[in-house]
Amino acid sequence: GGIGVGFSTIVPAQTLGQNWFLRRRALVIGVIFAFGGVVGWLVAPVDAWVLEHYQWRIGWIGIAGVSMVLALLAGALVRETPESMGQVRDGAVPPTEGGRDDVAPLAAISDRWTAAQAVRTPQFALMLVCGVAYSAPFNTAVAHLTLHLTDVGHPNAVAIGLVGTMALISIGGRVMGAAGDWISPQWALAVALALEGLGAGGLLLAADSTLALVAVALIGLGFGMAYISVPVVFSHFFGRKAFSVTTGIRMTITGVLAGLGPWLAGLAFDATGSYTGAFVGLMLVCWAGGACAAAMRHPGSPPAPSLSP
């Protein structure tokens, strides 16, 4: 299952979105993953319905059947690039009012990069920091937020509801990641990480119901925006040819590092009896990532190959 998810969802969907679209690249990727978020949000009620009326085996058979149908449809209908069908990105539509008019020239430069060249750049290293900065706080909140909220006095049902609210708001954040079509995508990422950091710090004030809601909303919104902005920045910097490999490498590294967040937060809580240190640390990690995003600039043309004597 994990291998199938890795091969068939995040990296391929991001790759196809940026292969086919340029001027509305962020919006397209945002819509794709917003629908993924909606499906994820529906899993729990559908799961409960299946268990109430059937049994768990029926649920898994249904998932397998849907997966096979979608795999066949994708194989029959989806094409990797518009050029494979005699088309071009965006259908060669001229820029619309309000969009960025520097996208196409930069894309022509970015498409010259190879993955081997891209992973050696400072921009790639900074994007690894940004990847950890947006995913570690959200992963940690999902794992520990219910316990923290009950510790500060909220009923268990309220705590669970706030965690669900955070996930739901992240869906809207993914659509808001479309801001990267109108402004520099690295600035959209910087704003997203700043918001997520505010939310992580705001969890220190979560004893108040209103402030708890604001905090989880900021985390969800910032995470959703960053989730879309990161692949858009990669496409903006390194183009189509290098995208899938650099994204796979980035997600592997940041997945391991960000996965340590819940574990480290648990260690901090066991040592101190409080989540204060963990939430302050996550806030600083977010803001460090935001600073990295704001500092990044387009890498320009790739280095010319060296000529051996």
Regions found by a protein language model. Give the residues of each.
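C-terminal membrane-cytosol helix-exit motif in multi-pass small-molecule transporters
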Residues: 65-102, 292-297
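Extracytoplasmic gate region of multi-pass secondary transporters
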Residues: 116-176, 261
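A late C-terminal transmembrane helix in Major Facilitator Superfamily
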Residues: 40, 237-272
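Intracellular juxtamembrane helix-capping segments at the cytosolic ends
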Residues: 5-21, 225-238
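Helix-loop-helix hairpin linking two adjacent transmembrane segments in secondary transporters
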Residues: 35-84
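Helix-to-loop junctions at the C-terminal end of transmembrane segments
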Residues: 173-184, 269-270
